[in-house]
Amino acid sequence: MKSYYVNKNKQANGDHEVHLNDCRYFPDADNRKYLGQFDNCADAVKESKKTYSQSNGCKTCCPSCHTS
């Protein structure tokens, strides 16, 4: 399982992006929330949506969950 985080700061389109901890776009400590360990990004995005309804996977580290 991998560790996933969500960026507390939304993107220009309103999305809060979900990242793996080794992503090159990994948010700074003050700007991220730990989501937990998951087998896939879909479960991590689902968890993120409990806090941020407009959540999306990072295009770089979670491309299969990137929708916008």
What are these regions (language model features)?
Residues 35-37, 41-68:
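Short, mixed-charge low-complexity intrinsically disordered segments
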